[in-house]
């Protein structure tokens, strides 16, 4: 998502480094070009601002698309297709940019979409239908399509055969290379967060103070918000005891 992640990717992980940012800082862009192989832009304006630099550096440029097709329920904060989203270029935005094929497309090697979050391949299929309807006329004019992350490929109920069919279909229909970002699936259920109860108290409810923090160790719990699974636990009132779990920090809302 910018200079520091690009540097980390290139220096620590190696291989092909892709970077995306909703907008790039001018004073950082030349250094980003030293690390990134693919630079994905969020808007046509960013392509026009930096596209020539990317081309001269011998790197590849992409444009993030917003197919305006929400497949998530109840998690607008993680939905790039939510109304008012700043993530990606919509079809009306392309129309407003003028002659796309003459002014923007010559700088592009690919298109990028990231619309999923912990989802199955049926939602990817729904997204692709919308993306092809809006932008499919240009897919065969680029080298690659990056379908982003959010694919829960390692989940037991994930339909991998459908995913294979979709990827093969894109390659055959448009002659493009297809990227999938690894995302959470590569480490799904690979470990546990272990915590201990330091103290218990009561203030209108039973509260357990832990030696771990939602804000510090699991920020998605507060930002999304969501309730992470706890081994042996149940819903409120289901078990003999019901406790709220809180962290040791001074943040009042640091609760799981």
Describe each region flagged by the PLM.
Residues 1-144, 156-158, 166-169:
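Active-site-proximal beta-alpha core segment in soluble small-molecule metabolic enzymes
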Residues 115-116, 145-154, 182-185:
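Glycine-rich beta-strand-to-loop/alpha-helix junction loops that act as flexible
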Residues 68-70, 118, 152, 215-217, ...:
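Short, acidic Gly/Pro/Ser/Thr-rich loop/turn segments
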Residues 166, 177-256:
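Charged (often Lys/Glu-rich) extended helix/loop segments that serve as interaction or gating elements
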Residues 89, 111, 149-151, 184, ...:
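Gly/Ser/Thr-rich helix-start
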Residues 62, 146, 178-180:
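A structural signal for short, well-ordered beta-strand segments and their strand-loop junctions
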